[in-house]
Amino acid sequence: MAGSAPEGTQFDARQFDQKLNEVLEGQDEFFTSYDDVHESFDAMGLQENLLRGIYAYGFEKPSAIQQRGIVPFCKGLDVIQQAQSGTGKTATFCSGVLQQLDFSLIQCQALVLAPTRELAQQIEKVMRALGDYLGVKVHACVGGTSVREDQRILQAGVHVVVGTPGRVFDMLKRQSLRADNIKMFVLDEADEMLSRGFKDQIYDIFQLLPPKIQVGVFSATMPPEALEITRKFMSKPVRILVKRDELTLEGIKQFYVNVEKEEWKLETLCDLYETLAITQSVIFVNTRRKVDWLTDKMRSRDHTVSATHGDMDQNTRDIIMREFRSGSSRVLITTDLLARGIDVQQVSLVINFDLPTQPENYLHRIGRSGRFGRKGVAINFVTRDDERMLFDIQKFYNVVVEELPSNVADLL
C-alpha cells in the first residue's frame, strides 16, 4: 500500500498560486483580505476547554492557515480560505465551529459538507477530538450507512453534523435533521465537491437553511463555480490565501517501517540505533509528554539523547539547540513546534517516531531549503492506524515512500 505511487502530477507551487490569482483577478471588490496573524493558539481568545483539546490532539503551534483563519471564523465572519489540502484547514474550521457552539442547546448548530465519505468521517474525528473537553456531540451523515441509525442519532440531538451532500439533503427533507438552529455552514474541499457534480445539491441544502447563517468555504482552488457559490450565499466574505513555503524534499530518501502497533516503536528505534552509525539525527513525536517519555526510555537503555519541547523555557531550549548544532549532542527528540526552527542541514537522519498530524508538517520536519540541497534520509514509523496518513502524505507531495531496505546503513 504505502509504496504505491500517488495519483496526480508533480505539484508546482508557483503555478498553483499564479493560477489562483488569475482566477481571482477582478474579484477584489468582492473579497476583503484578512491579514491579522496570531502566532500561538493562546493568543486567539479561545475558550480554555477548546485549547485543552487542541493541545491534547498534538497541535502546538498553529500552521499558516490556522494563524490567519481561526479568529475571523470565531468572529462569525463569512470566510473563504484557500490553501492546499493538508495545511490544517480542518482544524481551522473545527476550532471556529467549536468556539461558537452553545453547548446547553443539544440541537444541530453547525453543518459541514465534504465531498467524500472518508473526508466527512475524518472531519468528524477531528471535531470530536478537539471538542473532547467541551462535550461536543458530532455525527457523520454519509451514504452507505443506515438511514434509520442516522435518524435515531439526530433525533437524540447533536451539536454538529458533518456529511456528504446526498445524505444530508435526505435528512433535511425528512426533517430528521432540523435546520432551525443551524448558524454555521461549512463547505470543505469546495472545488472537489463541485467537480463531483454536487452543485445542485449544495444549492438545495442552502435553501433549507435559515437565512442568517455564517458560511465558510475551504478550497484549494477557486474555480468559477466556486466563486458563484460564494457570491450567492456569502456576505462580505474575507479571503485568506496561504502561500507555500519554499522547501523541497528533493534529494531526501524517504522510507517507512511497518511497526504494526504503537508498542513496538521503541524496540524498532533501538534496533535502528544499534545497526546504524548515525552522525546526527532528529526524532519527531507528536506530544510534549511523549518527548519526555521517549527521552527517559532511550536514556534508560544507555542512548545519549537530548530533548526539547514547548513546555521548556526559551533559555533551556536555546542551550539544548546550541549543543545539538555544535555536535556535542547527537540525537534530538522534539515536536512539530520546533520543526521549523531546527537548522537540520547537518542532520543525516530524521525519524518520524510519530507521523505528523497534518501533511504540511511532514515537509517542515524533513524538507530542506533549496539553497543547501543537502542529502538526507527520513524514516517513518507506521502503525496500522497511520496507513491513511502515509497515503495522504505521498499524494500531497507526489512522492513514493518505500519500505526500509535491509541495507539502510549504506544510505547514511
UniProtKB/Swiss-Prot annotation:
Pfam families recorded: DEAD, Helicase_C
Catalytic activity, as annotated: ATP + H2O = ADP + phosphate + H(+)
Residues recorded with modification Phosphoserine: 104
Species, as recorded: Arabidopsis thaliana (Mouse-ear cress)
Binding site for ATP: 83-90
UniProt function note: ATP-dependent RNA helicase which is a subunit of the eIF4F complex involved in cap recognition and is required for mRNA binding to ribosome. In the current model of translation initiation, eIF4A unwinds RNA secondary structures in the 5'-UTR of mRNAs which is necessary to allow efficient binding of the small ribosomal subunit, and subsequent scanning for the initiator codon.
Record has Nucleotidyltransferase as a keyword: no
UniProt tissue specificity: Highly expressed in the whole plant.
Protein name in the entry: Eukaryotic initiation factor 4A-1
Compartments where found: Cytoplasm
SMART domains: DEXDc, HELICc
Main location (coarse class): cytoplasm
Residues bearing PTM Phosphothreonine: 145
Residue ranges constituting the Helicase ATP-binding domain according to the UniProt record: 70-240
Annotated family: Belongs to the DEAD box helicase family. eIF4A subfamily.
EC number: 3.6.4.13
Motif (Q motif) on chain: 39-67
CDD domains: DEADc_EIF4A, SF2_C_DEAD
Superkingdom, taxonomy of origin: Eukaryota
SUPFAM superfamilies, per database record: P-loop containing nucleoside triphosphate hydrolases (SSF52540)
GO MF entry, a single one: translation initiation factor activity
Keyword terms: Acetylation, ATP-binding, Cytoplasm, Helicase, Hydrolase, Initiation factor, Nucleotide-binding, Phosphoprotein, Protein biosynthesis, RNA-binding
Modified residues (N-acetylalanine): 2
UniProt lineage: Eukaryota, Viridiplantae, Streptophyta, Embryophyta, Tracheophyta
A GO cellular component entry from the record: cytoplasm
